[in-house]
Each structure stands twice: as structure tokens, then as C-alpha cells.
Amino acid sequence: MTDKLQFPDGFLWGGATAANQCEGAYNEDGRGLANVDVVPIGPDRHAIITGQKKMFDFEEGYFYPAKDGIDMYHRYKEDIALFGEMGFKTYRLSIAWSRIFPKGDELEPNEAGLQFYEDLFKECHKYGIEPLVTITHFDCPMHLITEYGGWRSRKMLECYERLCRTLFTRYKGLVNYWLTFNEINMILHAPFMGAGLCFEEGENEEQVKYQAAHHELVASAIATKLAHEIDPNNKVGCMLAAGQNYPHTCAPRDVWAGLEEDRKNYFFIDVQARGEYPNYAKKEWKRQGITVEMTEQDLQLLKDHTVDFISFSYYASRVASGDPAEREKTAGNIFASLKNPYLESSEWGWQIDPLGLRITLNTIWDRYQKPMFIVENGLGAVDTPNEDGEIEDGYRIDYLAAHVKAMREAINEDGVVLWGYTTWGCIDLVSAGTGEMKKRYGFIYVDRDNEGKGSLERSRKKSFYWYKEVIATNGASVN
């Protein structure tokens, strides 16, 4: 039976990055300032990304890793050649909004920014790599935040629509796979990064978050509509930070807590995939005194323009309890979870659960019956070169192999429809959560440290050759 388990022909293997974590060149060729540029490494980072502390420009005494990233803006040809050497079928990347519209509300785009991405996409096609493009990945021009309050304002719909129309028109024939917002549910956990939100003292933060979420959901529907009109070959997906919530015990209140936590996550895809707000959300808003302003036109857009596929990031499952204050916690993707005593953890406390990926795939498939795409998965670890300068990252290979097996089982034994898999940070980049460089995910090592020092030289890790073989055999090399 095992030898019959395989990945479908045309399965899209690849890797993923984000503009704000790798491009650098924050002020070159007309690019404007963005929210992620001014998020520093250090103890204030969490307060800033959660909207509790305002930082709208660079301040003395801080180091801002996104300003330079890994200098992919100047080195993308070298990097894409390495992706081509691995045999990537797809490369997920994001557009820096402020490269295209530096302030965000201009009527005409910045040609230098448009040309940069056109050249990059053509470089991908040179190696037979299909671009998978995230329109906004924790990225908002700073002017839209200081002038309008970010996604709390309906003004953002107009600006985002102009961005999308520009991208879909310019890159018609070069890009056919689009994601509207990265990890859209992170607006609840990292609202400054996810939506450019900062809160005033005494403000109803949940009200602001859900109003901004409504604007992003409508914007996503507008993008889907435009993409299909401009090029019928376009496929548009949503993107969620996923991971099943297990009940801490079989106590009914723990099971209920897990269901509630899952609903908070799936709320966004419920709207994007089904086209309407779920009843449980309306009831919860009423209980909390939240009034989300929306028009009949908004609701019609949501209904008429659902996504073609569902993409998500998966790093770990989570644990929920009816008494969370009494339970031990562990780190996770931006926000913490309760600790699962049955799982091992990474150096950053993220718990390792490949079966959880299979469970998550089945949950999403059963809930929506839409094709899926895993667009982030990987192990953040400290990689130390040996005396020969090589990275022997067998721990990363073990992690990824276990998750590849889980995908294969979900496809062959459970019948889910999965289009592709892009590992996160296929080349080392700046961590979104911590701002660190030493938390590495890549198959390609980048010589740069947490203080911005290093040659930026690229080198292949052991996992580089492993993943190359995985792709060449369409997953058959993973036993």
C-alpha cells in the first residue's frame, strides 16, 4: 500500500518569502515608508505589532531589521537561480505596496516598483517557476496609517482596489496565482502588522479589529472580482494562520474552548469561502456590544466573489482549555498557546506536530470542500556552520519530512485536494515575530546576524540537497 501513496502530477513544490522580511532597500527607487519598516527588534516589538505602542518613524536606540532584510532587492537573480537549482515549481512572494504606491493613495503608480516585480517574475519564469503572489503580507504604506488609521477606514478599499487593478493588469500572463492578505486572522493578534492599527487608551479594541477585518474581507472580494475580470486564468486564494485547537482534556468545557478558538480562526475563511458572515460571529458581536458597519453592497460583494482556493500556514497545533490561566503556556506563531505535553518543541517553543497538519487539512477540506495550498511550513532553528562552513541541518530535514508524509497521507488516504506546498523562509530571512536573523528556516544560509552584521553571502545547507531530491521525485524520496 505504501508504495502507491504519491503526490499528484503537477503538484506545486516550492518556497515562500515576504517582501518586508527579505527585500531591504526600504527607501530606494521611490519606495515609501511602510509599517513593517519601523518595527524594531527588541523588547518593544510585541507592543508595537499589537498596536499598544505607536512607532510611525525610525527612532534612535533601535535596530530595524526590515530596512535591509537580506538585500534580496539587489540579489534576487542569485536567489531565484538557487530556487531554480532546487527545482522549485512555484515561489511564493509578496508585493511591497509602498514600492507600487509609495504613500498608498496616489492615483498613479511608481514605475520603478512595477518594473522591479516584472523583472523578478520574468526571472522566475526563466527557471520554470510559477509565481504565487501575496498582494499584502503584513504590509501597509505608513501614510495610510497616519492619514486614515489603516484598515479601520473605508478609504482603504479604494486604495487597495487601485493597487489590485494595477497589479492584475501589469502582470497579466506573468502571474496567475494570487493571495489577497497574508494570515488575515492575525488582525486579531498582531493588528499593527495585519491592518496598520494602533489603539487609543480606552478604545474598544475588538470593535476596531472587527471593523478593520470587515474592510479587509470586502477588499478581498473586490480583488477576487477584479482578478477574474482582468484575466479568467487567475486563481485567487485566501490565507490563514492555521492549526487545529485540541481540547486540553476531554472535559466538555475544554472541548468547547477548542471549538470556540477554532471558530475565531475559521471566521475569516467562513466569509471568504462561503460568502457570508456566520451566525456564531453575529451572536458573539452582539454579546460584546460590537457593531460592524457594513453596506448591502459589501454583503453582495462577499456573496458573489468567494475565493478559488484556501491557503494557509501551518507550524503547530494548539491547545485550548476552559481554565487557561491554570495551564502551562508555550510560544507559537505570533501568539502563545497552552502547552501540549505529548509534543516536542523547537528552540523557540513552537510545538512539533506533523499529524496536526493532516488533521488541519482534513478539517479545512471537510468544512469548505475547496482546493488547498500549504504556503508556509517550516522549522525555525539556530544553524551553526561546522569547521568546513557547512550547515548540517538534519533536524530541519526530519521536521519537513514528517510534514510531507502527513500531506501525502491526507491526499491519498483521506482524499483532500491539495495543490501545492511552499516551505516558509526557503532562504534565511528576518523573523516576523521576533525580528531575529538567528531564527532560520531556509535551505539557503545567509551570512547576517541579529545586529545586521555579515557578508550576506548565500550558501547551500544540507537540506537544500534534500529538498531538491524531494521535488525531483515528486515526494517519492520521502519514505
How would you name each of these model-derived features?
Residues 95-109:
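Glycine-rich, proline-tolerant flexible connector loops at the mouths of alpha/beta enzymes
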Residues 89, 98-100, 138-140:
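A short acidic, glycine/proline-enriched capping/turn motif at secondary-structure boundaries
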Residues 75-96, 304-310:
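Catalytic domains of carbohydrate-active enzymes, especially glycoside hydrolases
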Residues 61-75, 152-155:
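Active-site mouth loops of central-metabolism enzymes
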Residues 10-12, 73, 90:
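A common structural microfeature
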Residues 69-81, 102, 113:
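Internal amphipathic alpha-helical repeat/solenoid segments
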Residues 2-60, 103-105, 114-479:
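Active-site region of glycoside hydrolase catalytic domains
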